[in-house]
Amino acid sequence: MLAGLLAESHLMPLEQLPAKVGEHAEPAGLAHVAIYLTDLQRHVLRNLAGEGMGGCRHSVHTAELRIEGTVPGRAFQYGRLLPAASACPGKYRWWAPLLGGTERLGVLRATTEGDDPRTRQDVQLLADVVALIVVSKRDYSDAYARLIRTDTMNVAAEMLWRLLPPRAYSDGRVVISATLEPAYRVGGDAFDYVLDGPLIHLSIFDAMGHDMAAGLTAGLAMGACRNARRRNAELVEITEEIEKVLVEQFGGTRYATGIVARLNTGTGLLEWVNRGHHPPVLIRGSRWVTQLACPPGDPMGTGLGVAPEVCREQLEPGDRLVLYTDGITEARTDTGGEFGLSGFIDFLIRQHADRVPVPETLCRFMHRVVDHHVGEWQDDATVLFCEWLGSSPDRRDLAAAVAGVPLLRSATDAASAETSGIDGELPLRPDAMAPEHSS
């Protein structure tokens, strides 16, 4: 099944994927497969093939499903294979997360004859292969771009989304997640991260204004940062290169604040340069929170000549670093008050205590920011989150738990687990067999 699908994928456009998956999955005992992809803001799951009839009478591949309050939504949010009520008598229906690494792409639905550990493993393996194919095709598919949009996008957002890395990454050493709003009107915010051996480079930028020029400023800052970093420039030199590029382009009329940081995952040493930006927030354990003080340099692009400094902090395993922009703390409630830094951090701590995966935590937080917002956005809201797990790259179990990623075990191991299905799956709740979408 998987070998044939992979072989065909090299010469397959994205639009053919649902039909090809069905062709290869059904002979292996996985019937009525449907692929649902999340919208940009992660409110709904949309059928890649559109609406159509499934293989059982009255079974419909619904064109769109809500994420909140549904079984497929729960599989998406928590990264777990979940059962659901089947429209086919005597059959079993499953919802499996589609993950590009740890980036949540959507879910896959399949119907099977049995519910044994090997069957559950086959469903998740199919979902993993489908996710790899989606990731390999989406960057040059306008059909994908239209499918995941629920609103029209401005040109600045069109440019920035193409520059940004995936909103989630994890390995045994680190869990990274990011989010930004307004997704379709984003102007001057940007984030970036990259791996370089034991080093994790993190950066966040907030350009002056909320217009096309702000988007260009943020894009130039990201490009200059990457270019200098790939020439092995040190942190101060990287920010000076960004300054130089912005001054050359805008003559001092446009600037960007930002933080450029580097985490050594082998030692836990965090180094960063602050260029007129909010200080990073460090969360340790369940309660201890501090803002990491560092003498700031001037915003990049002003040409004021205030020399930046490199600051350092020794992290402990489990420490969570949070970088953010103005829009997070300045979002207004319906009574006119600000959401505030304390409300932001309290939310992160509560979600962590409830063992909510990091990508889902940031998604819920940003939904809450949007709900608090009244009127037109005056500034973008961006969060870049990084949790250092420790120096060993082999702590996959811990990374999977924090990031919400299913770990495949052998069928024998899965059969001996207390919870059914993929190892680490959440205990089955009474509502897990509820209808897969609600009215």
Language-model region placement:
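Conserved subregion of the PPM/PP2C metallophosphatase catalytic domain
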Residues: L2-L6, G22-H24, A28-A31, T38-Q77, ...
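A short, aliphatic-rich beta-strand micro-motif
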Residues: L82-S86, G90-G100, R104
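Regulatory cytosolic signal-relay segments
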Residues: L126-V186
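Short active-site segment of divalent metal-dependent hydrolases/proteases
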Residues: L160, G209, T329
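Juxtacatalytic helix/coil linker segments
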Residues: P165-T217
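Acidic, glycine-rich loop-and-beta core segments that form the ion-binding/anion-interacting portion
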Residues: M208-N232
